[in-house]
A protein has these predicted regions:
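Conserved hydrophobic/aromatic beta-strand scaffold that supports enzyme active sites
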Residues: 93, 129, 142-144, 176, ...
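Short hydrophobic/aromatic-enriched beta-strand-loop microsegments
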Residues: 64-70, 105, 128-131, 188
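A short, glycine-/small-residue-rich helix N-cap motif at loop->alpha-helix starts
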Residues: 25, 78-88
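Catalytic core and acceptor-binding pocket of nucleotide-sugar-dependent glycosyltransferases
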Residues: 147-236
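N-terminal anchoring/stem segment of glycosyltransferases
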Residues: 1-76, 99-100, 151, 208, ...
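GT-A fold catalytic core of metal-dependent nucleotide-sugar glycosyltransferases
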Residues: 86-137
Length: 236
């Protein structure tokens, strides 16, 4: 699955990693890029799956590093294979490439930053593995991978690849994150402070979401808030 990854893994000690297919990149990345650049002031690395020529041209013009790949149909044996493959690939890429000294924030491309973290929050996020706990899960939406757990990160990457190839498991990324890291020390990114994992159904939900550092609407049930940031807004 990784023999055809093209591009170079960044050497920054701290950066933000996101991964998506071409459709999500086109729809959500301008907002992701604009808000994380404005509030977090960190390098961004994009891994794009099955990119179009237009997306590649855009990446070349942006202040990002990137890798990309074309999907091998041999790994898509099951009805949900492509969805789980896209969800898990950032953790698989990260697990095989995380360098000594790196602390990498992993964020969904349809998330966006609302405000800058304070120094205590930055320390909580970057000093160790860090996850938000919700409904007994370690959430994949926004988390931090620390070089102190490079061995476990690679083990998680291998497990995810095996599950995608051998089963019709949905939510491979969160399943393996819990199996791999739950019993080891990690920093807790407090729910409703960092991010909110409840559905957005009412104006009160929007209000509570807007209090967090990161805004994210769950799955296809949410995403009611229009994406107002366009490619023109980031200079393309």
């Amino acid at each position: 699955m990784f023999t055809d990854i093209q591009g170079t893994w960044p050497t920054h000690e701290r950066f933000i990693l996101t991964s998506c297919d071409d459709k999500y990149f086109d729809q959500y990345f301008p907002r992701f890029y604009k808000t994380y650049k404005e509030h977090w002031h960190l390098p961004i690395h994009v891994h794009i799956i099955d990119p179009s020529d237009i997306s590649m041209q855009r990446l070349d013009k942006l202040d990002v590093t990137y890798t990309h790949c074309t999907t091998d149909p041999a790994v898509l044996k099951w009805p949900y294979s492509y969805v789980t493959y896209c969800q898990a690939q950032r953790f698989m890429l990260l697990g095989h490439n995380l360098l000594e000294g790196q602390s990498v924030i992993v964020a969904d491309v349809d998330s966006y930053a609302l405000r800058e973290p304070n120094e205590i929050q930055k320390q909580t996020l970057e000093s160790d593995m860090a996850f938000t706990e919700y409904n007994g899960r370690l959430m994949a939406t926004f988390c931090n991978f620390h070089h102190g757990q490079r061995v476990l990160a690679k083990e998680a990457a291998i497990k995810m690849q095996q599950l995608i190839e051998d089963t019709n498991t949905i939510g491979v990324d969160q399943l393996v994150l819990k199996q791999t890291f739950e019993s080891f020390p990690y920093n807790n990114l407090t729910h409703n402070e960092w991010i909110r994992h409840l559905d957005v159904k009412t104006e009160e939900d929007v209000k509570q979401h807007n209090k967090c550092l990161i805004y994210h609407e769950k799955g296809t049930r949410g995403k009611n808030k229009p994406v107002e940031t366009t490619w023109t807004d980031i200079g393309l």
